[in-house]
């Protein structure tokens, strides 16, 4: 079947040879409708056809255009294949060799640095053990000296006492009166022997084991191994009405307006923006981290359960009483505070996270910045009773990280 007898369409000439026919007109599909993106016959493309006014071109022209596109695409694919082949042949072997070389160098670096750290730790261990031994020897020698001194004192007192008893039992009145000066001298000699007094020289000084290097390495190890094992959450009963507590009980947000939703109770702080954790510690080693990067006014530390909760006095204010030990920040001022004593800390910038290490075995509280590996401050004291992690925030938000 051919397009003969069909109404003339756009352009001139008859359609291509036999092939698929138009289902509507039975003519060869010799034209292409760009609007409908399909082949059409001359009748469809003519004045009365359905594609009148559309973008019409001959089918062979459209086919030639597609052939040219295919050729261009094949050339691009050939170039792409060549580039990939060259990359696989030339670049990847070098990358692989460089990766092997860099991995070997990285291993050497790790070994070198850990070897240096190990050597430094061994040297520090030896130095500290020698200091401990030296302090033990010093205390032991002081005790021996005291033993000798008091043995001599006892012997002298016994001699004086024996002499005085002899005078008392063997001398008559006149002889006793004649010995008055001797009695006075012996009594004065006895009075010159003082009673024993408590002396730190007789005690082992635990400060001999304190080392900035050891403390820093120890804090890093403790935070890395223990932080996260403590499931520290805030006790909602203690939260100040000026604070909002998150659903997971780990985030405190400061509010300038006092919340009316908080029911007052004996555990709740009613003035200062404080909160206690639900967990307390009486012994052992504990560590936790707090995200403080969003706040310029906060306090983090530990407090005794005896910390008062009511009123605006210093007895309820963290760091201003005998029941709380805290690291605090106000703008660019950093301090460690306890019982109204505030120790300034010379920090150039505020930590993003604050690590807290509580070692109740040796009665030590330590604050640490994980990002820089810096011990911000350490406090040694005999802590009374169970201790609770404690928090205060007067700007934005702080969160228990883990």
UniProtKB/Swiss-Prot annotation:
A zinc finger (B box-type) spans 17-65. One of its GO terms (biological process) is cellular response to leukemia inhibitory factor. It is found in: Cytoplasm; Membrane. InterPro entries: B30.2/SPRY (IPR001870), B30.2/SPRY_sf (IPR043136), Butyrophylin_SPRY (IPR003879), ConA-like_dom_sf (IPR013320), PRY (IPR006574), SPRY_dom (IPR003877), TRIM/RBCC (IPR050143). The gene is BSPRY. PANTHER family: E3 UBIQUITIN-PROTEIN LIGASE TRIM. This is B box and SPRY domain-containing protein. Keywords: Calcium, Calcium transport, Cytoplasm, Ion transport, Membrane, Metal-binding, Transport, Zinc, Zinc-finger.
């Amino acid at each position: 079947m051919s397009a003969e007898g069909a109404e003339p369409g756009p352009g001139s000439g008859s359609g291509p040879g036999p092939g698929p026919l138009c289902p509507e007109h039975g003519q060869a599909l010799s034209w292409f409708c760009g609007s409908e993106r399909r082949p059409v016959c001359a009748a469809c493309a003519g004045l009365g056809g359905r594609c009148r006014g559309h973008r019409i071109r001959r089918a062979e022209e459209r086919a030639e255009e597609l052939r040219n596109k295919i050729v261009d695409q094949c050339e691009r694919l050939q170039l792409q294949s060549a580039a990939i082949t060259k990359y696989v042949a030339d670049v990847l072997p070098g990358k692989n060799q460089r990766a092997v070389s860099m991995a070997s160098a990285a291993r050497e670096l790790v070994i070198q640095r850990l070897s240096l750290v190990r050597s430094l730790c061994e040297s520090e261990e030896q130095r500290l053990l020698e200091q401990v031994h030296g302090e033990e020897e010093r205390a032991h020698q002081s005790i021996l000296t005291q033993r000798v001194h008091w043995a001599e004192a006892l012997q002298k007192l016994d001699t004086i006492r024996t002499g005085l008893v002899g005078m008392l039992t063997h001398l008559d009145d006149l002889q006793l009166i004649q010995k008055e000066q001797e009695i006075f001298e012996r009594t004065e000699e006895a009075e010159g022997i003082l009673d024993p007094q408590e002396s730190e020289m007789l005690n082992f000084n635990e400060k001999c084991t304190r080392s900035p290097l050891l403390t820093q390495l120890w804090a890093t190890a403790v935070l890395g191994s223990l932080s996260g094992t403590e499931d520290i959450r805030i006790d909602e009963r203690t939260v100040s009405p000026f604070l909002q507590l998150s659903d997971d009980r780990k985030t405190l947000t400061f509010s300038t307006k006092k919340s009316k939703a908080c029911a007052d109770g004996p555990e709740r702080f009613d003035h200062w923006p404080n909160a206690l954790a639900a967990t307390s510690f009486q012994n052992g080693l504990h560590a936790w981290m707090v995200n403080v990067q969003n706040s310029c006014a906060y306090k983090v530390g530990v407090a005794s359960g005896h910390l008062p909760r009511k009123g605006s006095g210093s007895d309820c204010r963290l760091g201003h009483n005998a029941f709380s030990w805290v690291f605090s920040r106000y703008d660019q001022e950093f301090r460690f505070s306890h019982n109204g004593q505030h120790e300034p800390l010379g920090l150039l910038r505020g930590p993003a996270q604050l690590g807290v290490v509580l070692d109740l075995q040796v009665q030590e509280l330590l604050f640490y910045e994980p990002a820089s590996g810096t011990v911000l401050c350490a406090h040694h004291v005999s802590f009374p009773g169970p201790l609770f992690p404690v928090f205060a925030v007067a700007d934005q938000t702080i969160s228990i990280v883990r």
